[in-house]
């Protein structure tokens, strides 16, 4: 029990991660670990639903990313599929994907400028796809960016 509490004190973990870490030691067996996990759940030290929601929001606030990338990152945390899906849905209700892609586009434009050539647009699109954003959303936002970029030059002429 003390080892489990020390692990949780270091950082929040899922039930699967705690189970794996406790079973690493030769002196533990599955029955003891299951008992410890049950006690931790009674004390509300372990809650996969809350852990998944907090982690999803934290990842989105750290760096804007699309659903695919977030799902891939959270899948390594040994959470069941329904918990992951619920947490991701809740995170994107709080921080809409269209706002996140706008933030990612603004950052990229600030660093590299508005893509002018076909090759630059292709690289920009690939960058956003690697961030996990959906292609249709990327295409829509980049078309809007090109319209916005062309608009000021028309006013000057």
Where in this protein do the model-derived segments appear?
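An alpha-helical, amphipathic repeat domain used for nucleic-acid recognition
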Residues: 1-157
């Amino acid at each position: 029990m003390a080892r489990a509490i020390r692990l949780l004190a270091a950082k929040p973990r899922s039930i699967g991660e705690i189970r794996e870490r406790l079973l690493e030691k030769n002196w533990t067996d599955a029955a003891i670990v299951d008992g410890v996990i049950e006690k931790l759940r009674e004390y509300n030290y372990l809650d996969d639903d809350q852990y998944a929601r907090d982690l999803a929001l934290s990842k989105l606030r750290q760096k804007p990313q699309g659903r695919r990338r977030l799902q891939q990152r959270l899948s390594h945390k040994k959470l069941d599929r329904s918990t992951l899906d619920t947490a991701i849905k809740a995170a994107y209700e709080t921080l809409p994907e269209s706002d996140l892609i706008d933030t990612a586009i603004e950052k990229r434009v600030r660093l590299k400028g508005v893509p002018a050539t076909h090759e630059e647009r292709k690289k920009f699109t690939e960058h956003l796809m690697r961030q996990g954003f959906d292609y249709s959303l990327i295409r829509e936002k980049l078309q809007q960016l090109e319209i916005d970029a062309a608009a000021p030059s028309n006013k000057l002429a």
